Amino acid sequence: MSYLKFDKTLMTNLEEALPREILRTNRSGAYHCTTIVDCNTRKYHGLLVIPVPELDDENHVLLSSLDETVIQHGAEFNLGLHNQGDNYSPRGHKYIREFECEKVPTTIYRVGGVILKKEKLFVHHENRILIRYTLLDAHSATTLRLRPFLAFRSVREYTHENAQ
């Protein structure tokens, strides 16, 4: 039995879910830090944050997040969640059914007849994160589209949208 397991009720309530953060590290100095609903709310949050000693003495966010979109019958369901001021979009947390954080952080999503499992694991001595998706159930042909948000910025800096 897992003591770090959260169900749909908590995961769909942002007031309860956003203050709960997860931090995973490896032996090379890299880390993954975000909220349990995968919404980066702090400037040091990121899916892959690593030290870059050739550049400076700071950690750098290389991969901010990885947005998943489930596509079925031409309909798209974005599983991502981003914070833009007081607005949260695209609100993919509503598809989370369960989150467990034992040895491997695991999130279960349900979108209609699709049940998708996501697991995140660090490689011990490398600046690398592995993400495995398992399609547990689907009643029809299903496509999973992945969209990485690359940052390559210091954890001390924010990046802003270009004005163009």
Task: Kindly label every feature range from the protein language model.
Residues M1-Q164:
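Terminal accessory carbohydrate-recognition/targeting modules of carbohydrate-active enzymes
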